[in-house]
């Protein structure tokens, strides 16, 4: 629709896949040009990420995507790791973002979240891909939702196992998230920002 001039960018969390946002796309495309993207390193055939991969690298990737799409400004929605990508883009290239919506970010990593991350990492390293993928819903969704959506969840898990990214990439992304300290960057961001957290 040529009458829609504003662009809305969605950035996913640790999984990094654009299809995380699929349930929201139909609604938002009525009001915005929508851009969703798979983050670097999350495809089955992705090249290995560098050993010192950082959140700033994820932000640089998005800046490059925006420039390649000739986008001079956009609104931004990010979930968890994706929220921090938005913060870093706002710091690196503030002119590219107008408003930010940050879902489930944190100002510092608390013990509970760190424990969840460490357990997921241990599952992947010592038990394998299937256990890592099938445990993910337990960390992300309430029990009732899991029970009510068993079929679609199982289908998604089976697809995720088949298409799993290189394990070193998953660990590099997880470690970059665990190491990230958002407070300093957040203090420099002057954009209108809505934070939604539970």
Predicted regions and their residues:
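Conserved HGGG/HGGXW glycine-rich cap/lid loop of the alpha/beta-hydrolase fold
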Residues: 1-48
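Active-site loop/oxyanion-hole signature of alpha/beta-hydrolase fold enzymes
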Residues: 35-77
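Glycine-rich His-Gly loop
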Residues: 10-13, 80, 198
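Short beta-strand/loop motif that positions the catalytic acidic residue
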Residues: 189, 195-197
